[in-house]
Amino acid sequence: MTKNSSRRLFLRKTAMATTGIALASTSSLLNGLTKDDSPFNGYNPYTEQKTDLRTSLIGKEVIVTGTLYDATGNKPVSNAKIEVWHLSPNSQKYNHRGKMYTDKNGHYKFISDWPNQEQGKQPRIYFKVSQNDTVYFTELIFNNLGAHISCKHWEKQHVLGEEKLFPTMKTSLNTSKINFNLSINTNQYI
C-alpha cells in the first residue's frame, strides 16, 4: 500500500510539473508578464538611454525638441523620463527607440532617422512620459508638409494653449526640426 501512495504522489507531482511547464511556456502568459500596457505597438520597457537613434548618417533625419510642463502648462518639469520609439526606415519593425530625461528647464531633445509609416497612416513617433507614478502616452504625427497631433493629444494637452500645444516643423535639405511640447498630470493616463 505504501508503494501505491508513493507512486500516486509521484504521478500527481509529475502531472502538476508538466502542467506548470506547459502554462509557463505559452506566449500569452509570457506576454502578460512582460508586456507594458502601452496603447501603441512597439513599446519596449528595456530601452537604453540614448538621444541619437540614427542608424545611418546618410538619409532623411528628424530632430525633435520640446519642453515638458506641469499640469498647469506653465511650469517646466525636470528629471522626467521620456521614452520614444518608431518604425525603422524601410521596415515594419520598431528598432528605433531611446530613453532620455528632461533637464532642469524641462527640455528634451533627440535625433533619429525619418520613420517608416504603418499602412494607411502618416509617419509617427510614439512617446511615453513618466514622472513618479504618473505616465502619459502620446504620438507625434508628421509628413513632408508639417507636424501634427492626434485628437487624444489635444484633449489631454490643451492646457498648454495654442502657442505651446501645436508642434512646429522646419525643414532644410534632409533634416526636419520639430518642436513638440508636452504636459503631464495625474489625470492623463491612457
Across the structure, where does each feature detected by a protein language model lie?
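N-terminal secretory signal peptides and thylakoid transit peptides that target proteins
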Residues: 1-21
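Residues in and immediately flanking transmembrane alpha helices
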Residues: 25-26, 83
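Bacterial Sec-dependent signal peptides at the C-terminal "C-region" and cleavage site
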Residues: 26-34
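Beta-strand-dominated extracellular/periplasmic modules and repeats
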Residues: 35-162, 174-179, 188-190
